[in-house]
């Protein structure tokens, strides 16, 4: 089955990376839809950010507003029932015996892409876009390029469809991700990401920093804030 490559389905959580990927997709495809997943995460703040980001992006550009289509919310609560992680249960963030942070939810991205692929086939969409990245901190195995290549092949075979997975942030660090947002949508998109997206593992929205809201000390906040500072330092040093 041939799927059109002029359309994309963005895995959109409401965080910095997926918001940047949404802008990236709107810059490249004729029709863009979004898909989000409620998997029983400890803090639903990201999910609450999703409609705000979509609405703000519509206001930023009439061209993007015309391209941005339907949003789909999927119940993936089965992930929480499989076992405790720091993303789904009230446990402290730590390293596991396997050498991975316990913020890793086993199988999460594999399930997300499977569900997104099934929806894309029904919607006549040929490209799935995800904000996975193997450059920064986590080392999550389901964020690696090899994993996504294998997942793409599995979807193509299992769905008999010419589906492609694009991961525009795969080899970018957080500083480069901020720069990409600037290139795609200028100061307006950078400001939108800072104000409306959410990354903090602890769900903190009370403290506003230059880079956005968060506790400032969890691994996700440190990654985002350090990336912001490196980006700012790079701009200041530029001739």
Curated annotation (Swiss-Prot):
Pfam families in alphabetical order: QueC (PF06508)
Entry EC number(s): 6.3.4.20
Official protein name in the record: 7-cyano-7-deazaguanine synthase
Keyword hit for Mitochondrion: no
Record CDD domains: QueC-like
Gene3D superfamilies: HUPs
Residues involved in Zn(2+) binding: 200, 215, 218, 221
Necessary cofactors: Zn(2+)
Chain positions recorded as ATP binding sites: 12-22
Lineage of the organism: Bacteria, Pseudomonadati, Pseudomonadota, Alphaproteobacteria, Hyphomonadales
Entry function: Catalyzes the ATP-dependent conversion of 7-carboxy-7-deazaguanine (CDG) to 7-cyano-7-deazaguanine (preQ(0)).
Root EC class: ligase
Species: Hyphomonas neptunium (strain ATCC 15444)
A molecular function (GO) term: zinc ion binding
Keywords annotated in UniProt: ATP-binding, Ligase, Metal-binding, Nucleotide-binding, Queuosine biosynthesis, Zinc
Catalytic reactions on record: 7-carboxy-7-deazaguanine + NH4(+) + ATP = 7-cyano-7-deazaguanine + ADP + phosphate + H2O + H(+)
